[in-house]
Amino acid sequence: MRAPPPFHMHTALAQGLKALLRQLEERLALQSPLKVFLAGGMAVHLYTASRVTTDVDAEFGSRVFLPGDLVVDVRLEDGTRELLYFDTNYNATFALMHEDYLDDAIALDMGVPQIRLYVLLPLDLAVSKIARFADNDKEDIAELVRLGLTTANEIEQRATQAMAGYVGGLPMLRLNLRDAVALARQAEAERGAGGNSRA
C-alpha cells in the first residue's frame, strides 16, 4: 500500500478552498461535523499544485443546501484573480467511480472545525476522468502518473472493477479506458526518462 501523498496546502487555490469551507461552515451554522469529499480539478491541484480550477467538485456526507452565493476571490500566483465556488451541478454518479472511492478517500485537516474534508485518492481521481476524458482530464491523468501518485496498471485494474457498477455506454468507456491506460504508460515512460519524481 502506497504511503499517503503530500498535499500542497500553501498555494493560492488551497488557501481559497480553506476560505470557502469556512464560509460553508458559517452559512450552514454547523453544530456537528459535516463530511465533504473532494473530487475534480481542485483535488488534483492539492496533489500536484499544477492544476488551476475555479469550480469545486464536492460530495457531502449529509444532505445539504448549498447557498449559490458562496464565492471566494482568489489572487493566483501569477497575479490573476479568480472566483472560487462550489459546482452545485456536480454529481459523482456521472463519473466512473469504484465502489470504495469514498471509503478510501484521504482525510485532510483544513483547520475548519466542523468540516471533515476527505480527498479522493489519486487513483480514484484518475479513474473518475475516464468517462468524460476531455483534454483537461487527460492532462490530469498524465500529471498524477508523472508524479508517481498512481500507475497505469492500477488505473486499469480499478477502472475495470468500477465498470461493474457503471450505467451507460460501456463500449465507449472501454475505448476511453484503453486510451487512458496508454496515456498513463506514456507518462510512466516520461517519468522513468527523468521527468518529475515524487517528493
Residue ranges and their predicted role:
Residues 1-199:
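Compositionally biased terminal segments of proteins
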